[in-house]
Amino acid sequence: NCGNGACATRKVKTFRVGNPVDWLPLLILGVATAAFGKQFPPWLYMWVLALALFLGCKWLCFRIELARGTNAGVGRKLGFLFGWIGMDAAAFFAKANPTEKPRAMEFTCAATTILVGSVLLWIVTKHVLTINPLLAGWTGMVGLIFVMHFGLFHLLSLAWRAAGVRATPLMRAPLLSRSLAEFWGERWNTAFNRLAATFLFRPL
């Protein structure tokens, strides 16, 4: 920072990957789920494990922004931790652009997607099950993705954006991808992409 003819450096906090405090929730939740979750039915064990990993990773992303010195208020922080599915804390805590407010058509599309997914999940799957159990499993999975990832999670993104928060949609129209890299890197499951870019990938 420079002013009055003099310059000074400002120490910026950095996120330490090796800090045990930052990784402790993920470790505890993961170990506890692996140790005690197998007594649950397989489908419930899967959901509990997914929730444990999600909460642990959410905490790591939250800690990064705390270390960088975010100016977000308590309400915004709690909203990111417990009211949003994404992992991009920097965008969530930043000031939103008024032009990013969602359009009414986006709400309609999300609601329609939930309806289509519900039909696949609770009606079509039952009929397909009598013909081919494997196909029924895939049909149910597609229906669930429509209901959750393209439907409910997108509605949640729209609600936050309507409130002036930069909540990037989890699915960003993946069918519009012009390349495989764009599909996986920018449009499909942006929460996972943020995790991979932050903790796995490193610039060459």
Which residues are covered by each model-predicted region?
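Hydrophobic/aromatic-lined pockets within catalytic cores
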Residues: 61-64, 156, 160
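N-proximal short alpha-helices
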Residues: 25, 29, 132, 153-157, ...
